[in-house]
């Protein structure tokens, strides 16, 4: 790969993780004026329109699939896309944006562990090291440094909901690896957005406390900007940038950039005037170290092996 192509890939991945990280405090700010379900409807609605227009522009027809394949793709999308967004934004209404970003930083690791269980393979030493270190960093933040809370399972309810959303997304990510062999990713993502929109819309219909139309008409310009940012940049833009980066540097190298999500979340939260504590920064550093150290050790072994070859 040329240096210019490599630089472009790095910029794409950094911009992508900025969009994703910023979506946490931006979403937290929007929840001051709209219900979590209303926010998710906006996100899915905007993303669906943008992805549809992109697919039409690129002349991407819907694939020809069997009813079983359609059912599987829609079902997995409802669990993953719907579960993530429902858990994330419902949880953010009750917890700190930085906590949410830290919990979501566990997703690549959890996806790897799900793969190990599904394939009946024992996780690698690097994966186990990352699991212990990263969980320690996350639990440090979620318990406010009082690990005695673990004995009584005393966690913030919002943190628990986001954790469940992260599990849904990790399962979705693993299952998507199989679906991608027979369904292109852009149409698959569009199906995911439409499936999520349908499920959340049904939930809104049966939720007496949620009034998306009235809430949308009453929002301020800043919150309208928040919703547009989450829908366009935090969803569609981030996804397309991620695909572009992965194609150029590979999935393994690209996954390292996921470590920047909590960093950008903290920076954006600070810009919004939201609280960023020293404990959260320490937990963030521990999580990033837990994810990076095994990769750096592996790279070092590979370099030594190439020198000795």
Range-by-range predicted roles:
Residues 11, 23, 45-50, 103-117, ...:
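Alpha-helical transmembrane segments of compact multi-pass small-molecule transporters, enriched
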Residues 17, 40-42, 81, 85-86, ...:
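Helix-helix packing/entry segments at the starts of transmembrane helices
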